Amino acid sequence: MTTEAAVLDYKVADISLAEWGRKEIEIAEKEMPGLMATRKKYEGKKPLAGARIAGSLHMTIQTAVLIETLVELGADVRWASCNIFSTQDHAAAAIAAAGVPVFAWKGETLDEYWWCTRQILEFEGGLGPNLIVDDGGDATLMIHFGYKIENDPSMLDKTPGNAEEKALLQQLKAVFAEDNQRWHKVAAGMKGVSEETTTGVHRLYQMMEKGELLFPAINVNDSVTKSKFDNLYGCRESLADGIKRATDVMIAGKVVVVLGYGDVGKGCAHSMRSYGARVIVTEIDPICALQAAMEGFEVTTMEEAVKEGNIFVTATGNKDVITLDHIKQMRDEAIVCNIGHFDNEIQVDALNNFKGATRINIKPQVDKYVFENGNCIYLLAEGRLVNLGCATGHPSFVMSNSFTNQTLAQIELWQNDYKVGVYRLPKKLDEEVARLHLGQIGAKLTTLTKEQADYIGVPVEGPYKPEHYRY
């Protein structure tokens, strides 16, 4: 049950959880040195003064520290989660109680989710945002889809391809009825978007290639201090947390199939092996497949692995990588989960519509499917992000890397006039983000002498690597 305040502009599960949320935010601040150093650096300067930021990113305790950093730097912020299960209700309550409009609660319906996304794009006085912090690209998608509809209203009559599209169209119909040029006005006022995750970045590049991108974007995901830390080390800890909270299963001795061996898949595979599992990897990319094999993982196809796995983890960013046919072949009591951004990596709709299986809810975000032969599988978080649906996501320290990049990207977009395109933060800023986190873990940097720097052709203070360097 959600509560909506008559006076304050927010919608959360339970505002009385705010004190609990505030206590956890204070703990997280101590583990997020990058964000706290950024606050200190810009103290009194308000580099985001006048910015209206719409945030569509998991409403967690760590995100609360990001939100309050943006506010402290002068921004007017509205926030929603980018996933129906990822909100931590005490975090949302604490931010709402602090006066920031937030629209998020754990367990939203798809209709509620897109309603929440619409709310963050509507600022006081009928204004739209001029900046977006996005994770997965849904806020950006809503503006672009709405813009297309205003150019071709017949799109409102199209048959939705799925429940998600139906919910989005419902919101866009309501907006169109109120103002049939709303999204043109919003797009015209946009300075840009900073995108957090691989899936959202993929969407941005696709729009750019088609000539459809309406405003500049900064690809935060491919900053080294995001992709090689959040995606790798974050997943290495939070995947196991999600699986264990959901099932209490012993991982040691199990066969775990990890689908995809990008940065996220690498973190997952190493995590499961560290618990004593035998890990099998599936891959389409020969380079990633060779990396997995050289790390000692068995690399094969899903058609082979499906017969062996006890636990399946999708980490591809693609659709239909675990099909209904795969699920029907799995061993009894197999656990199936996803750690990619969207829920279409596993054919959940096909499973739910399959008459040969009975769905039994065990507890929130854990469902048992019993097949006619007596075998069963357990699906976690309805095929959505298992680490956020069944646990609390990545630890604060690694999220400080990602969110410091997000903050710097927002300042960069606000203070400069970028042409439409997809950009990355410069190497110098990437190195600075890493530098801000070293002291917290007791690491000490060696300093080049002038002669050494000249010898390898880099400045004493960096950057130390060329843009094409692969860490």
UniProtKB/Swiss-Prot annotation:
One of its GO terms (molecular function) is adenosylhomocysteinase activity. Pathway: Amino-acid biosynthesis; L-homocysteine biosynthesis; L-homocysteine from S-adenosyl-L-homocysteine: step 1/1. SMART domains: AdoHcyase, AdoHcyase_NAD. GO terms for biological process: L-homocysteine biosynthetic process; one-carbon metabolic process; S-adenosylmethionine cycle. Gene3D superfamilies: Adenosylhomocysteinase-like, NAD(P)-binding Rossmann-like Domain. Its cofactor is NAD(+). Binds 1 NAD(+) per subunit. This is Adenosylhomocysteinase. It comes from Chlorobaculum tepidum (strain ATCC 49652 / DSM 12025 / NBRC 103806 / TLS).
